């Protein structure tokens, strides 16, 4: 039996991170991008790097730069960074967690913050997944 607190090998951490990112986060990012486009915003989801970062970029049609929500791995610390950047005021908010932080509740909370604070919007799909009074 292995110690659950023992760190994973870097290779195993990166593999689990990539699998979790694609299985849990990517579909939620794609749905948020679709909702954003339906609300008249320009939105794009992309990955970059190794280990991959998943990024949702959103901008108003009049904006030349995008606000974003990015999930990235910190292999040295074996943690995940959830990063929100708001182009309107240049602020960044970062939430650190373990691999288990790549879940619908954390991602929905971050997406809700990005759209509420960055664009004054509520995403219908996020609102539908959570009961009234959740936020």
Regions found by a protein language model. Name each.
Residues 102-135:
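Amphipathic, soluble alpha/beta structural segments
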Residues 23, 35, 71, 75, ...:
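A generic structural signal for solvent-exposed, polar alpha-helical segments
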Residues 59-113:
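Intrinsically disordered, low-complexity regulatory segments enriched in Ser/Thr/Pro
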Residues 1-32, 117, 125, 129, ...:
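Charge-rich, low-complexity N-terminal segments
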Residues 3, 9, 47, 72-74, ...:
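Serine/threonine-rich low-complexity intrinsically disordered regions
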Residues 31-79:
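Amphipathic, interaction-prone secondary-structure segments
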Residues 19, 50, 61, 91, ...:
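Intrinsically disordered, low-complexity regions
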């Amino acid at each position: 039996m292995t110690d659950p607190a023992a760190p994973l090998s870097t290779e195993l951490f990166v593999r689990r991170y990539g699998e979790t990112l694609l299985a849990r986060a990517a579909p939620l990012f794609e749905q948020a991008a679709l909702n954003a486009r339906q609300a008249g915003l320009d939105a794009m989801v992309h990955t970059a790097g190794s280990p991959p970062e998943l990024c949702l970029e959103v901008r108003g049609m009049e904006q030349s730069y995008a606000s974003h929500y990015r999930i990235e791995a910190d292999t040295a610390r074996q943690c995940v960074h959830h990063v929100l950047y708001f182009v309107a005021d240049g602020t960044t908010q970062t939430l650190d967690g373990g691999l288990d932080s790549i879940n619908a509740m954390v991602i929905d909370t971050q997406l809700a913050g990005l759209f509420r604070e960055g664009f004054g919007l509520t995403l219908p799909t996020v609102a539908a997944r959570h009961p009234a009074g959740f936020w």
